[in-house]
Amino acid sequence: MEDRHRYLFFIFAIIHYVQAQQGFISLDCGLPSNEPPYIEPVTGLVFSSDADHIPSGISGRIQKNLEAVHIKPYLFLRYFPDGLRNCYTLDVLQNRRYMIKAVFVYGNYDGYNDYPSFDLYLGPNKWVRVDLEGKVNGSVEEIIHIPSSNSLQICLVKTGNSLPFISALELRLLRNDTYVVQDVSLKHLFRRYYRQSDRLIRYPDDVYDRVWSPFFLPEWTQITTSLDVNNSNNYEPPKAALTSAATPGDNGTRLTIIWTLDNPDEQIHLYVHFAELEPVGENTDEALRTLFTRTFYFVVNGKISYDESITPLDLAVSTVETVVNKCDGGNCSLQLVRSEASPGVRVPLVNAMEAFTAIKFPHSETNPDDVISIKVIQATYELSRVDWQGDPCLPQQFLWTGLNCSYMNMSTSPRIISLDLSSHKLTGKIVPDIQNLTQLQKLDLSNNKLTGGVPEFLANMKSLLFINLSNNNLVGSIPQALLDRKNLKLEFEGNPKLCATGPCNSSSGNKETTVIAPVAAAIAIFIAVLVLIIVFIKKRPSSIRALHPSRANLSLENKKRRITYSEILLMTNNFERVIGEGGFGVVYHGYLNDSEQVAVKVLSPSSSQGYKEFKAEVELLLRVHHINLVSLVGYCDEQAHLALIYEYMANGDLKSHLSGKHGDCVLKWENRLSIAVETALGLEYLHSGCKPLMVHRDVKSMNILLDEHFQAKLADFGLSRSFSVGEESHVSTGVVGTPGYLDPEYYRTYRLTEKSDVYSFGIVLLEIITNQPVLEQANENRHIAERVRTMLTRSDISTIVDPNLIGEYDSGSVRKALKLAMSCVDPSPVARPDMSHVVQELKQCIKSENLRLRTGLNQVIDSKSS
């Protein structure tokens, strides 16, 4: 019972504090999502986890020995190893003024003792570069900003090798009649109260949780009061900051405050708070009152910047606002100067002051209706792309994958004009929020698992010029209004139950059509088979027919690429040059038409299973076409001679390059990433772009070939299997594949699926990263995945990466690639990603590496120009 009462008391306390902090958002970044909100004991502020406001990042904690000097909200942090841009989304009040604070306490959370730097963005605009070098106690960035919508995005952007992170996010709603500026935001420069002290003032003394630091120079004189000071003006500076003031020392007549700027051209906004702490009594006669009234002028950078003289109010605050357009050489000064004509004897004073630099954010956010629509689409289809964060269209280098936008000028909001969600395994109906993208010109939803009908609203989207709904499970009739649209290209093949014209056939009223169609089809198939059998019997010797009874299944269409054995002899110059050898047979170099280089794979006569694999590869390669799959030029099927003719891949296979068989040439990290993503694209096509889908079943580095430009193409389809509509996407089989690359799940189920290819690709990716053998013979055939998993727990990535790369890589992209590879080789097939996800993740790795290369190039150019 006592515990229950204590719990209820805690809940009521939280509610009380939250109600007192209306308009506050206080996020403890990295605090585990299962941790409840808590009251920070020093300030009484209620902090909660940030997990509901960002889809990415990993929780970290500063080192134990550093925790004592920080308050609780700064002990945890969230760091971002994935993606270039990671964004918080916060619900705010549109067109209301907020103070936004971002806190960064590194605390050597990663053990590297390497202080990071990165960029911080507000929506599509850069706010500030965060550089923590030398800032042992952390850093705080603060800005006063008016959101243009009811959703605010705060993004951390990777700029180099270090990982962005954040400790806390704090938003405070301000009065709209304070800090009023035109078309700019105010970046915090300093906020001081003038007293000899070491105490920071913040909430609850300051109702807006502004943090005031003490400042005092030895040559000044301090005055204080124990009387109450009225702080009731628009700004409400805390009373604790108003009960002291600085005045000139040694009977001086002017008080000088100096500060410096990194950029001398920055515009400065000053807010100076005054209160008279030595009031003249009410009963004092007029002459003495005049003598002891404090009157002075405001002089900035040597010029009077405030037309009227300033007379502080007795024990009450008044605030003077002024703008400084430029500080020569970055040296700024504010002087409070007693007027020589003033009859008063008192010198100037200042109680507190705030200084800001003006930032003009050039880019307008993407049209808010488009943003709402694309986020509803993202949520409906559960699209978890790491780059689908922040503003969809801006900055352009962070444009969401699959989108294109129109850009007029920086002051006009971009519009989404193209949406490509092909091959994303979308399920359910076509989401109606697509129609709210009113400027959409291109819509691609092909190669998914969408159901339901084609919606009428597509016909009403006047901007649409192209719609691709191919290869889904859509049903019913296409709206006539959509078919009647001129200047609209509509693709919808691969939807068996979707009708192009008129009402679809049903079980009633269309029985005659239902019966006639299959009968006619059966007759046509029978005649075709009969013709094939007759031709086959006439042309083939009986011995060959007995050896290969299913050869008649090769279609007549395939014969268009048929090459005779004599042509094979001619193109290979009687099999002069061997370029490879495998279980299928020998591969020879050759020339087609005396000009085009080709690779000729000849079936060994001793191969008992050769013809089945030969047939599979011919039929597969003749119907798949992808830039990252090796193209079949032709084939030979002549009596006892079987051969496949491929495009020639001048740079051999990936394994030979990794093993050093090509001399001293080491594949750079950017080249390895390109090879990985190109291989992944080939596999993605087999799994998602082919109907029916295909499983390669023998993905390995030796089957990844490189052309003269080092473009990767997947080869050796002899073991591949395709799956018809309605057939389960797995195959029960005898022993296939290559030891080390073969899915361990196969030894339990004797089945191979798309996730088996994913596993094999993960092994290849580990080879690419580490350049280690898949099976280590000197260590009882210990597997590469097991070795890397152990190394990840004991050391950093530099000991895992191929030493031949000599550190020339972006550590973030390597870390991301390693994480991806380990997810691909997860023992549970369900936990492995699909190839579409693999492609997207590898593209992010390439972006990170390209950013490193561009940064390095710019540094070289800068050094040469200087």
From Swiss-Prot:
Keywords: ATP-binding, Glycoprotein, Kinase, Leucine-rich repeat, Membrane, Nucleotide-binding, Phosphoprotein, Receptor, Repeat, Serine/threonine-protein kinase, Signal, Transferase, Transmembrane, Transmembrane helix. It is found in: Membrane. It is a single-pass type I membrane protein. Residues 537-866 are cytoplasmic. Residues 1-20 form the signal peptide. Residues 573-846 form the Protein kinase domain. ATP binds at residues 579-587, 601. One of its GO terms (cellular component) is membrane. This is Probable LRR receptor-like serine/threonine-protein kinase At5g16900. It comes from Arabidopsis thaliana.
